[in-house]
C-alpha cells in the first residue's frame, strides 16, 4: 500500500493461519484498509490478468476473489516465474499486458467476491498464476516498511518435523506485542530454500527474541532484526 495505507496483515489470519481454527489455512495475507484506498505494485512487472473471476477460476470456486489483478513480477525465483495476486478490489486501473513500475497504481481496495469487509488480499504464486495451491508467504516477497525487517523461522519437534499451529511470540525492547502461528498443514507451502513455517514482517530494526512453549519447554532464540533483511531462527525441542 502507498504512504497512508495500512501495510500490516490482519494478525489472526496471516499466511498459513486459520483465525483460531474458524477458517481454512490462509493462502495469502489480508491488509485491512478503507474502500477506495489505492493499491500499488509491490515490484516492477507485467499485468498477467486484470478483471473479475466470474468466468475464470483462480481459487477453488469462481467469484471468490471478485475483481483482481495478477502481476507477473520481473523478479524470478531460481528462474521460476513469480506472480502477485491482488484481490477483492473495488476498481481496476490497469489492463492485461501492461508493464508497471514498483509503486504504480493497480486499483483500489474493495470487498468484491467473498470478502466480508474492505481489505486487500495479497498472494504470491509461483510457476502457475491460476493454481490456488502454488502460493508462498507474501511477507517474504514485499519490501518491509522503511527501517524495518522480517523474522522467519522453523518450529520443530524432537524428530525435526514441522510443528503446526504453534504460537510463536516475538519479544522486542519496544514492548510491542508480536505473535504468529506456524503454518497449520502441509499444504501451506514454505519457500523451498528457506523452509520456514512462520514469518512476521515489518519489525523495526532492533534485537528481539523468538519464543515458543512446547511440551512444557520454553524455547528461545535471539534475532537481530535489520532493515530490509530477513532474520532467521530455529526453535526445536531437544531430543530425549
Set out the residue ranges of the language-model regions.
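Surface-exposed, glycine-biased beta-strand/turn segments
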Residues: 1-68, 74-76, 102, 111, ...
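A residue-level detector for short acidic-glycine micro-motifs
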Residues: 49, 88-91, 108-111, 157, ...
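Conserved, short, structured surface segments that act as functional micro-motifs
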Residues: 59-71, 98-148
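Short Pro-Gly-centered beta-turn/loop motif in secreted/extracellular proteins
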Residues: 188-209, 214-216, 225-227
Amino acid at each position: 500500500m502507498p504512504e497512508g495505507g495500512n501495510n500490516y496483515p490482519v494478525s489472526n489470519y496471516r499466511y498459513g493461519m486459520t483465525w483460531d481454527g474458524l477458517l481454512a489455512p490462509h493462502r495469502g495475507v489480508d491488509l485491512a484498509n478503507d474502500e477506495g484506498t489505492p493499491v500499488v505494485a509491490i515490484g516492477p512487472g507485467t499485468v498477467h490478468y486484470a478483471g473479475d473471476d466470474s468466468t475464470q477460476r483462480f481459487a477453488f470456486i469462481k467469484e471468490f476473489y471478485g475483481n483482481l489483478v495478477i502481476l507477473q513480477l520481473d523478479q524470478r525465483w531460481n528462474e521460476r516465474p513469480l506472480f502477485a495476486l491482488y484481490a477483492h478490489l473495488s476498481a481496476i486501473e490497469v489492463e492485461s499486458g501492461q508493464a508497471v513500475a514498483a509503486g504504480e497504481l493497480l486499483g483500489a481496495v474493495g470487498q468484491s467476491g467473498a470478502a466480508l469487509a474492505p481489505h486487500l488480499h495479497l498472494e504470491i504464486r509461483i510457476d502457475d498464476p491460476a493454481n490456488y495451491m502454488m502460493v508462498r508467504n507474501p511477507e517474504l516477497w514485499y519490501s518491509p516498511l522503511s527501517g524495518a525487517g522480517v523474522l522467519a523461522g522453523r518450529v520443530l519437534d524432537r524428530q525435526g518435523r514441522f510443528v503446526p499451529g504453534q504460537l510463536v511470540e516475538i519479544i522486542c525492547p519496544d514492548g510491542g506485542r508480536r505473535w504468529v502461528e506456524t503454518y497449520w498443514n502441509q499444504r501451506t507451502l514454505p519457500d523451498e530454500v528457506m523452509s520456514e513455517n512462520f514469518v512476521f514482517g515489518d519489525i523495526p530494526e532492533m534485537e528481539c527474541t523468538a519464543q515458543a512453549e512446547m511440551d512444557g519447554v520454553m524455547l528461545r532464540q535471539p534475532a537481530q532484526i535489520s532493515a530490509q533483511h530477513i532474520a532467521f531462527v530455529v526453535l526445536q525441542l531437544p531430543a530425549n
